Structure formats: structure tokens, C-alpha cells
């Protein structure tokens, strides 16, 4: 909205009038202040330039965020692989321990059975020995022992 020399702008606060030429003069004064400032301090940056810089900054931030997320995903993937390998190793060890435990249990049962058989055989031999040492009816005891 540009005003011509004829139009006036009314200020709502103090009812003073400002002409279009006065507005143009004020804007020119503000722009000349910016160009006269060699240090660049308090320099007004155009809105488009600010928007462009903000857009670039946002893109870089989003890129960093994506890279960080990708790196974290890769770290987690490596950890999953490492844990899967460790899990398989533990499963193999467990299977080996269970297998050894089963073997030991079977061997223990076999030895118990063998022990009972040997005790029975020992008892038979003891009876036979007693029968052989006793003079009375040696032949009857011998036959009885053999039948058992």
C-alpha cells in the first residue's frame, strides 16, 4: 500500500497526520542508516534472507538428526547381532550340559543296577561258601544254592 502525495495517514494515538511523502522520507532515512553503518551492527536482514537461512539451518538440523538416528539404528543392529550370537553360544552350552547330564544319569542308573546285581551275586557266593563249610548235608545245600 503506497500512498501518493495527496493521501494522508492518520495516526490513531495522537491524531497527527503523516503524508505519503513523509512515510517515503522516513523509509529512505532508515535505509540510508543501514547502508551508512560500516560495521554491520543492527543491520536489518531482509525477510527472504532470514527465511532462506532458517530453511538451510532446518535442513542441516534434520540431516544431523537423520544421521544420528541412522547411527543409533546401526549400533542397535550390531548389538542385536552380537546378542544373537551370544544367545546361540549359550544354547549350545546348555544343550551340551543337558547331554552330559543325561549321560551321567544313565551311567548312574547302570551302575546302580550293576551294584544290585553284584550284591545279589555276592550273597549267592556267600551262601555257597557257607554251604561248603558246613559238614551236614553239604550236597543238599549245594543243590539248593545252585537252584537259586
From Swiss-Prot:
Stretches assigned to coiled coil: none
PROSITE patterns: BZIP (PS50217), BZIP_BASIC (PS00036)
Transmembrane portions of the chain: none
Domain bZIP span(s) in chain numbering: 48-97
A molecular function (GO) term: DNA binding
InterPro entries cross-referenced by the UniProt entry: bZIP, bZIP_sf
Main location: nucleus
This protein's GO CC annotations: nucleus
Keywords: DNA-binding, Nucleus, Transcription, Transcription regulation
UniProt-annotated location(s): Nucleus
Any Pfam family matching the protein: bZIP_1
Name listed for the protein in its UniProt record: Basic leucine zipper 4
Origin species: Arabidopsis thaliana (Mouse-ear cress)
UniProt lineage: Eukaryota, Viridiplantae, Streptophyta, Embryophyta, Tracheophyta
Amino acid at each position: 500500500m503506497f500512498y501518493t502525495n495527496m493521501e494522508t495517514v492518520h495516526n490513531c494515538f495522537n491524531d497527527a497526520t503523516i503524508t505519503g511523502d513523509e512515510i517515503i522520507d522516513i523509509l529512505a532515512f532508515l535505509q540510508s542508516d543501514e547502508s551508512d553503518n560500516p560495521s554491520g551492527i543492527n543491520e536489518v536482514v531482509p525477510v527472504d534472507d532470514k527465511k532462506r537461512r532458517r530453511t538451510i539451518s532446518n535442513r542441516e538440523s534434520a540431516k544431523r538428526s537423520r544421521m544420528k538416528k541412522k547411527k543409533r539404528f546401526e549400533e542397535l543392529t550390531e548389538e542385536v547381532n552380537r546378542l544373537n550370537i551370544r544367545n546361540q553360544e549359550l544354547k549350545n552350552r546348555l544343550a551340551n550340559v543337558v547331554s552330559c547330564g543325561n549321560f551321567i544319569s544313565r551311567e548312574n542308573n547302570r551302575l546302580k543296577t550293576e551294584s544290585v546285581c553284584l550284591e545279589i551275586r555276592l550273597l549267592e557266593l556267600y551262601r555257597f561258601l557257607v554251604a561248603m563249610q558246613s559238614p551236614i548235608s553239604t550236597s543238599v545245600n549245594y543243590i539248593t544254592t545252585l537252584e537259586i
